[in-house]
Amino acid sequence: TGSFKRDGVDRIEDNAAEVAQYRSEGFQATKIKIGFDPDEDLRVIAAVREAAGPDMGIMIDGNHGYDAIEAIRVGRAAAECGISWFEEPVVPEQLDAYRAVKDGQPIPVAGGESWHTRWGMREPIETRAVDIIQPDICGCGGFTEIRRIADMAALHGVRLVPHVWGTAIQIAAALQFMASMIPNPVRNNPIEPLLEFDRTDNPFRQAVVKTRIEHVDGVVTIPNEPGLGIEINRDALKEFSPKAV
């Protein structure tokens, strides 16, 4: 995940160059931020597809920046770029708008980071407001609750891809959960789980653990030590703690 809108640079060129860098590092998919101006967003999507080449997966994340009319328009136009999913196209409380977007354009709709516990996920899953549900293990209620959400999604044929955002502690937790995920459907070549791997500049993210969780050619190894597989760097916690002035 990356490709935000930054001040002082040409957004289209900046996002395209960033995705080209991800491709050179071995990543097989990338998620870019949209939800600003629909026309500019579509130009960004086209430029990113050109930079990524034909085989790299591209997801678009609206961060609930559109209304349903805009989201449907963007989805219809962006579909020709081979988009894997359209995340949070509209405000998370507007489930009717989610369903309208899902029905009104061809890209699979994803969402879930803003819904909490199985009770918050129940209606989106049961009414198929989304094609892909994205619970955040640190926001939905932890390991037990995300397991319940995964079971509910499987009952209704909704794909689950965890949302991951924060420090290496959350990355480690998500990796341990993903390692336990049951393929849905069970088959000889199951759908491999995707780890959202934040590439934005955040020195705190990896500083909180003694051994960094990094990728090699776009693949992250699951920590194999007890518990989450990590050891907290308490010196870093002190370093980044708020200081009295």
Where are these regions (language model features)?
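A cross-family glycoside hydrolase active-site/sugar-binding cleft signature
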Residues: 1, 31-35, 59-63, 87-89, ...
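N-terminal capping/lid subdomain adjacent to the active-site entrance of alpha/beta enzymes
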Residues: 1-58, 63-80, 104, 199, ...
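Shared catalytic-loop signature of beta/alpha-barrel
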Residues: 76, 82, 93-110, 115-219
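Short low-complexity stretches enriched in small and charged residues
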Residues: 14-15, 42-43, 87-91, 131
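Catalytic P-loop NTPase motifs of RecA-like helicase/translocase cores
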Residues: 66, 92-93
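Conserved, mostly hydrophobic/aromatic
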Residues: 30, 61, 86, 124, ...
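Conserved phosphate-coordination/catalytic loops
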Residues: 9, 13, 39, 92, ...
